[in-house]
Amino acid sequence: MKLLMVLMLAALLLHCYADSGCKLLEDMVEKTINSDISIPEYKELLQEFIDSDAAAEAMGKFKQCFLNQSHRTLKNFGLMMHTVYDSIWCNMKSN
């Protein structure tokens, strides 16, 4: 499960590097770490990225990993992601 989380985050970061301007990445991360969003709501919000039942199940498990975390951990994760957004690697593509 941890490997799945790392791979999904790596894919999101690569998408950011691929000239998304990081807005899509920021929105997805915010939805992922928002503990007020349930798994069914999360899947619905990200439906355009889910192309199979296996992907839907993986997204549900991915969201559950974050739902299992404390508020403090989620806050720290959000802070870490904002540090990534503000890094030279994301800003380099938007300049």
UniProtKB/Swiss-Prot annotation:
Keyword Glycoprotein: yes
Residue ranges of coiled coil: none
Record-level GO BP terms: androgen receptor signaling pathway
Domain of life: Eukaryota
Record's keyword terms, sorted: Glycoprotein, Secreted, Signal
Entry GO terms, CC: extracellular space
Tissue specificity note: Expressed in thymus, trachea, kidney, steroid responsive tissues (prostate, testis, uterus, breast and ovary) and salivary gland.
Chief site of localization: secreted
Record CDD domains: Secretoglobin
Subunit structure: Heterodimer of a lipophilin A and a lipophilin C (mammaglobin B) monomer associated head to head.
Protein purpose: May bind androgens and other steroids, may also bind estramustine, a chemotherapeutic agent used for prostate cancer. May be under transcriptional regulation of steroid hormones.
Record protein name field: Mammaglobin-B
Species for this entry: Homo sapiens
